[in-house]
Amino acid sequence: MLNRRSNALITLSRTKFFPITTVAYYHRRLPNQQRRAVSTSPKKEIKSLEDLANLDSLDGVDTELIRDLINEHTTKLNIKKELDMLKKFSQEEESGHEIPVKRFIRPLWMFILMGSSVYLLLHFSWWKLEHEERESQLKKEVEILEHQLNELIVQDKTHNTSRGKGSNESTHMKPWYRRWFW
C-alpha cells in the first residue's frame, strides 16, 4: 500500500511473519532545480551526475551541489529498491495465500481408492449374503416340492393298487390302438 503525503512516500506492507513500514522522503523540488550549478565554464550547467562525469575536473564545482546530486540519486535508487522489495513481498504474500492444487491431488486419489475399495468389499459381502439367502430359500422350495412329489407318488401308488387289479386286466385286453385313443 502506498500513501503519498506532501513530502514523504510511505509504503506499508504487512504479512503474517513481519510487518514492514518504509518511509522515503523526497523533495518537491529536486536539488538541481533549487540551485543552478556553478561551473568553471559558463557554457555548461550541471543538472545530473552524468554532467559531473563529463567534466574534466571537479575543481570549480560547488561541493553542496555534488552532495545534493549524489543524495538525490541515492534516494531514487533506495526508493526503487524498496518498491521492488515491497512488490516481491506482496507477491510472496499472495502466493502464500494460494493453496496449491497439487497438495490435494494425492490425498484425493487416496480417498477415492480407499472409498472404492471399501465400497467393493461391502458390495461383495452384501452380494454373498444375498446369494446365501436366496440359496437357502431355493433349497426350502426344493424340499417342499420333493415332499409334495413323494406324496403324489405315494398317492398314485395307493390309487393304482386299489383300482389296479380289475382295470389292469381290462386295459391289457384292449388292442393297443384303443388304449391310446379311448
Curated annotation (Swiss-Prot):
It is found in: Mitochondrion inner membrane. Residues 128-182 are mitochondrial intermembrane. It comes from the Eukaryota. GO terms for cellular component: mitochondrial inner membrane. Residues 128-158 form a coiled coil. The keyword Transmembrane helix applies. Residues 46-107 are mitochondrial matrix. Keywords: Chaperone, Coiled coil, Membrane, Mitochondrion, Mitochondrion inner membrane, Transit peptide, Transmembrane, Transmembrane helix. Residues 1-45 form a transit peptide. It is a single-pass membrane protein. The keyword Transport does not apply. Belongs to the INA17 family. Component of the INA complex (INAC) that promotes the biogenesis of mitochondrial F(1)F(0)-ATP synthase. INAC facilitates the assembly of the peripheral stalk and promotes the assembly of the catalytic F(1)-domain with the membrane-embedded F(0)-domain. Component of the inner membrane assembly (INA) complex, composed of INA17 and INA22. Interacts with a subset of F(1)F(0)-ATP synthase subunits of the F(1)-domain and the peripheral stalk. This is Inner membrane assembly complex subunit 17. It comes from Saccharomyces cerevisiae (strain JAY291).
